[in-house]
Swiss-Prot record:
Gene Ontology CC annotations of this record: cytosolic large ribosomal subunit
Name used for this protein in its record: Large ribosomal subunit protein uL22
Native source species: Paramagnetospirillum magneticum (strain ATCC 700264 / AMB-1) (Magnetospirillum magneticum)
Gene3D superfamilies with a match to the protein in the record: Ribosomal protein L22/L17
Gene coding for it: rplV
GO biological process: translation
Length: 128
């Protein structure tokens, strides 16, 4: 318990998107989040489009939202955006029961996850 940590204040060159209660385990979601960390925004969108993982569709939507936030709310250049941070957190776990042999029950856990994506604008190169 205790006090919740204060939200990190975004820099002027950053934009954020958050999705709560995604119906997958944090471990599975983190595999997809790891794959886009540090990539340019358009390359990351392309990678998620052709990913075979089911949850990549949801991650793609969050990334598109972060890019739209950067463009519309912070007036950042979309061509210079990259995925600065993509991190996963645990959400609730639904517990269900499954009938088993001899009158017993088996516990089924259905985990949920939270996803935060932060995109940042790269500084212009000196030669440009």
């Amino acid at each position: 318990m205790g006090k919740k940590p204060a939200d990190r204040v975004l820099a002027d060159t950053e934009a954020k998107a958050f999705l709560a209660s995604i119906r997958t385990s944090p471990r599975k979601l983190n595999l997809v989040a790891e794959s886009i960390r540090g990539l340019k925004a358009d390359v990351a969108l392309n990678a998620l489009t052709f990913s075979k993982r089911r949850i990549a569709v949801e991650v793609r939507k969050v990334l598109q939202s972060a890019i739209a936030n950067a463009e519309n709310n912070h007036q950042l250049d979309v061509d210079r955006l990259y995925v600065a941070e993509a991190f996963v957190g645990k959400a609730m776990v639904m517990k269900r029961w499954k009938a088993r042999a001899r009158g017993r029950v088996g516990r089924i856990e259905k985990p949920f996850s939270n996803l935060t994506v932060i995109v940042r604008e790269r500084a212009e190169a000196a030669g440009e």
